[in-house]
Amino acid sequence: YIKDMGKLERHEQVQADIESGLVASRNLALTQRAVFLDRDGVINIDSDLVKHPDEMVLYPDATKSIQALHSAGFVVVVVTNQSVVARGLTDLKGVEAIHARMERLLAEEGAFVDQISFCPHHPDKGYPEEVPAFKIECHCRKPKPGMLLDAASRFNIDCSNSWMVGDSERDILAGQAAGCRTIRVKTGHGLKPSTVVPDAHAAGIWEATTHILAAK
């Protein structure tokens, strides 16, 4: 549980969270519920491979969605494939700078995520700009569940009581492989045909959030 309580209204919110049991429930000795969020097309507008911090533009409902999930006691983890590293379009520091901008934009409206996990790999080889060290088969690239399972281990997450929200087939497959319930949003690549069936569909991150809160 993290909260800046330097202002009176924030102090009052922390006091309310203590009295409601929210603070105690975030003790990692206790099993946690989580919402795993894909990044591009869910939290931010997918501009076809985000390569620079200036290309990080949040969806209008992203901040209030993440705030609502935290208020309900969920751990919020971003799990994102970032093959821009393997393709040589940016490097690890570049991705970290993009994430720093995302976190700053969220923080400006009072929201935060508990962890950002990203996979820099891509299995396909033969492109001129590619970085060979990252052109490998790995356990973390979705649709494999590695990023979700690693976060589950760190935060003591019960995946059977958690959700994966994504816009692509690989997001849903990763969530299912980890044992999570899944929601596919219609933003980003969410309208592309797929034979993979999620537990629910949603117009965007806010509708996905309201579905999760109603189901808990």
Indicate where each model-derived feature is located:
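Conserved Lys-Pro-Asp/Glu-containing loop-to-beta segment of HAD-superfamily phosphomonoesterases
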Residues: 131-133, 139-169
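Substrate-recognition element of Asp-dependent hydrolases with the DxDx(T/V) motif
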Residues: 62, 66-102, 111-126, 175
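Metal-dependent phosphoesterase signature
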Residues: 44-59, 85-93, 108-109, 131-140
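Active-site neighborhood of HAD-like aspartate-dependent phosphohydrolases
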Residues: 31-77
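Acidic, Mg2+-coordinating phosphoryl-transfer loop and its flanking beta/alpha structural elements
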Residues: 163-202
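Conserved alpha/beta core of the MobA/IspD/sugar-nucleotide pyrophosphorylase nucleotidyltransferase superfamily
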Residues: 1-30
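Short, conserved phosphate/pyrophosphate- and ester-handling motifs at nucleotide-, phospho-/glycolipid
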Residues: 7, 144, 204
